Amino acid sequence: MKLSTKGRYGLKAILDLAVNKGNGAIAISSISERTGITVNYLEQLISKLKKANLVKSIRGAQGGYMLARDMTEISVGDILRALEGDLAPVECISNQESSCESANLCVTKLVWQRINDGINNAVDTLMLSELVEQSKKLNPYKLNLDKNKC
């Protein structure tokens, strides 16, 4: 499984919101400035995160975006699925109906299922709050979300 820029940049954007959560609602231009993600692309990402009830918008002069839930309640899996959809490596084990006629007889399906289980376990047990703590340990003065980095 390879994540698209939606998943990678969306995770950076919500991590920026989490790191800066004590500053009230955060303008999308501020997120863009810190992460190097264009405002237009951020608007698309934030829209998906809002639909998944991970981010909320605040209107007005001091408006912007903030987390909709506590960061201890938001998993990386929640974020990635909101942006990418199902994380299954192959169609036959996704939550969607498979078009593969031999899915029930497929020996390699066991491999794909184990990979899927491992991915889901990893992203569902890693919370946004853990990423915030890790970012503070790595660089307590600046969140490293440079667009040229992973």
Q: Where do the protein language model's features map onto the residues?
A:
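Residue cluster at the C-terminal edge of the helix-turn-helix DNA-binding motif
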Residues: 51-54, 82
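Short amphipathic alpha-helical interface segments
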Residues: 10-22
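Basic amphipathic alpha-helical segments that dock to polyanions
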Residues: 45-50
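Key DNA-contact positions within bacterial/archaeal DNA-binding proteins
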Residues: 40
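Beta-hairpin "wing" of winged helix-turn-helix
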Residues: 54-62, 66-67
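C-terminal regulatory/oligomerization modules of transcriptional regulators
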Residues: 94-150
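Conserved segment of winged-helix/HTH DNA-binding domains
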Residues: 71-96, 108-109, 113-117
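A short alpha-helical element within helix-turn-helix/winged-helix DNA-binding domains
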Residues: 30-35
